[in-house]
Amino acid sequence: IQTIGRAARSADVVLIDTAGRLHNKQNLMNELNKISRVVDRELPGCDRETLLVLDATTGQNGLIQAKQFKEAAGITGIVLTKLDGSAKGGIVIAIAQELQVPVKFIGVGEGIDDLMPFEAEKFVEALV
């Protein structure tokens, strides 16, 4: 919360990593919602990107998770990780379609160069 206040005074970019939030842990989701409200209050009108990072091995539970994260924080995009293994991440199609939230990036490894822009055609080819 203090980071957001400081950013309002002197930063061009703020990254807030809320790793470990589980949609079934209400206190953590409430905290996420609070962070979102503070950003709205302290940085009104800012260009804001709120990304939900989803593991490609996530099944149908991913849709429930995405719905609750969208409600709590207004997600604007999805990052689909762990596509370097046998996981295909097909649930992301249902999430993107139902919630009207685009997939922005994919992760295919653990290095910084392994985060790549999402390319729908390549993703669909890999699914079939």
Please place each PLM-identified region on the residue numbering.
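P-loop/Walker A NTP-binding module and the surrounding RecA-like catalytic core of P-loop NTPases
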Residues: I1-V128
